[in-house]
Amino acid sequence: MTLNRRDFIKTSGAAVAAVGILGFPHLAFGAGRKVVVVGGGTGGATAAKYIKLADPSIEVTLIEPNTDYYTCYLSNEVIGGDRKLESIKHGYDGLRAHGIQVVHDSATGIDPDKKLVKTAGGAEFGYDRCVVAPGIELIYDKIEGYSEEAAAKLPHAWKAGEQTAILRKQLEDMADGGTVVIAPPAAPFRCPPGPYERASQVAYYLKAHKPKSKVIILDSSQTFSKQSQFSKGWERLYGFGTENAMIEWHPGPDSAVVKVDGGEMMVETAFGDEFKADVINLIPPQRAGKIAQIAGLTNDAGWCPVDIKTFESSIHKGIHVIGDACIANPMPKSGYSANSQGKVAAAAVVALLKGEEPGTPSYLNTCYSILAPAYGISVAAIYRPNADGSAIESVPDSGGVTPVDAPDWVLEREVQYAYSWYNNIVHDTFG
């Protein structure tokens, strides 16, 4: 039976609330077991919380360098001007209230043999099981002329917070008639629909305040997530495909940005075309966060292979890798995927510490994109292990995508669903 959108929201909402749907065992009070979680983003915070909820006797330590976490999801609304940066900032007091030890330090090494996590501050944390949620590392040097230092002028804004604010200010400072270049990388990367939602939000701001301006997307890929839905929205809102289009899309490997000159504010594509811009939003290629590389958890492509039933590393036993860093195709690298994977890993960790076989999990994802205040679209899916447990597959006839010809009331409702989802997931993760 195909789920309609209302039923899917109900189903996924219930899954967020009900720990048992992800196979958690009943409460078990073990003796002095320790779990160290490295990384306090959506995946890591979720895993830490749900391990502690499932078995309060487990000593859970979360190691995260930042005292506040800014969600990438809904950060594009900050760039578009309809949301304040503070609204996507979240702290860790909620996790502390559950009895989790939160250590604000950077993990610098993991010894899988001695079962130790080392930090920049010189501390060592022993563990029985370790969960690594390192997020992504941006590979700046894949683009000639780009670097972490250059990102202060040529923001990626693919890690929310300061970078989000930089990009927003540049748009505010730009004169009417200016050009904004957005350059997404080739897949895989964090939040596949993100660059196109960003283009929409930038166009929304420019249409209202700087209507002579233009957004140019220089895309490494030929296709993108929710492409038909985005294209329809761009046509309706921003004149896409017309002579007066506010958004231009240049697809394919030849359009990939390979060189940037921050002084001249110029980018060059693989084909050799040059584009001068007033604002350059350059999103570089990505790989698993640095600690995953240091710990030897990555493959040659820079991502972390895992057992999809437990998210235990295929390289180092006793270490589970979740979120953007892990290989969990066809699940996208998204906040909701990280939350879902955090719960699956938590259930597996608790079971394994009891000497039990973890249950068979299911996984959820929904990605909302807001093109304008009353124009939202989404894609949703339920996933499960395949027959032999070697890979993740989509459950047939589950989830769905916003119809291309959806009426206005549906598009407006999607925005409200997005806000409700956001409030629920941040409470579920950090509350």
From Swiss-Prot:
Molecular function terms from GO: flavin adenine dinucleotide binding; sulfide dehydrogenase activity
Q: Where are the disulfide bridges?
A: C191-C367
- What is the protein name for this chain? Sulfide dehydrogenase [flavocytochrome c] flavoprotein chain
Oligomer and partners: Dimer of one cytochrome and one flavoprotein.
Annotated EC:
1.8.2.3
Residues binding FAD:
Y70, T71, C72, Y73, L74, S75, N76
Kindly list the places in or outside the cell where this protein is found, as annotated in its UniProt entry.
Periplasm
**Record key words, sorted:** Disulfide bond, FAD, Flavoprotein, Oxidoreductase, Periplasm, Redox-active center, Signal
Q: Name one Pfam family in it.
A: FCSD_central
Show the InterPro entries listed in the entry.
FAD/NAD-bd_sf (IPR036188), FAD/NAD-binding_dom (IPR023753), FAD/NAD-linked_Rdtase_dimer_sf (IPR016156), FCSD_central (IPR049386), FlavoCytC_S_DH_flav-bd (IPR015323), FlavoCytC_S_DH_flav-bd_sf (IPR037092), SQRD (IPR052541), TAT_signal (IPR006311)
Q: What else is known?
A: The active site is a redox-active disulfide bond.
Reaction catalyzed = hydrogen sulfide + 2 Fe(III)-[cytochrome c] = sulfur + 2 Fe(II)-[cytochrome c] + H(+)
Show which residues constitute the signal peptide: 1-30
Post-translational modification remark: Predicted to be exported by the Tat system. The position of the signal peptide cleavage has been experimentally proven.
Q: From what organism does this protein derive?
A: Allochromatium vinosum (strain ATCC 17899 / DSM 180 / NBRC 103801 / NCIMB 10441 / D) (Chromatium vinosum)
Q: Name one GO cellular component term.
A: periplasmic space
